Amino acid sequence: MNYYAAPMEGLTDRIWRQAHQRWFGAPEAPVRYYAPFLSPPENRVLIKKKMAELEPAANPGVQVIPQLLAKDGELAAWMIGELRRMGYTEVNLNFGCPSGTVTAKGKGSGMLRDPQKLDAFLDAVFSQAGGPVSVKTRLGVARAEEFGEILDVYNKYPLCELTIHPRVMKQLYRGQADREAFAAYLPACTAPVCYNGDVTTVDDLRALEAAFPELSGIMVGRGLIADPALLRKAVGGLAASREELRGYHDELYHGYTETFGMASCAVSRMKAHWFYLIHLFDGADALEKPLRKAREGWEYETVVNQIFACWPK
């Protein structure tokens, strides 16, 4: 089974990808990392700072798949061409993001409101794709039954892979992923299918592999931030040790401090990781409030040392 790290804005950036690969990468279970979405500029002028995340030199030894968030097929096709010139083979199209600020612009899962517009978008992309294109999607806007018409559109095109998150746009991340709907639509998919949604434990991975052996892959998001060793454990490897987690944390923290130029900005980014990661530490729940209140580097470092003193769980 192929394992993929889901794109998560503010979490799975180049610094995290490098740290995760270094500390928890498993040769027997190589991970493909999907980068957080990039929106192509309407004036077709690339912003160097935004593109720096995807520079091959910034991602050595890591297999990265760039993801596009767009509603203009011609503009997306142009951006795919730019990414191919950077050396990327596969490019992923985001029709899954449920954020209101995204869908209000008709992007992400907002594209699923109108299958005809979705069809026109994909037609423009594939008429000049020049290589593999994959899609990440939800089942629809309000009802899982909408996916029949949406899937008819996807099946018209040679997608190299279709990643399905079996929720609808209006759910955001509430409720449970609809695996019954996923199972019902899976046989009708002509592209290789990857599953994404509510995968947080090794048991979840094994259950999916047993239920759907035909899957091309499984994509893990929040579960991998909460347990960086999750995919290593899935192939029989060890759980994360205290020393590994400390090295992983320090690489992230120092990497963000160097990138942002000040520890206080790095602290803000690290809090997003600790929201998930803290549950690996026994009794550390009591330190969540002091962690949230920390602003300066020294305050943050003091709390983090206390958290690591709580190991093991």
Stretches with model-predicted labels:
Residues M1-K313:
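Flavin-dependent oxidoreductase catalytic cores
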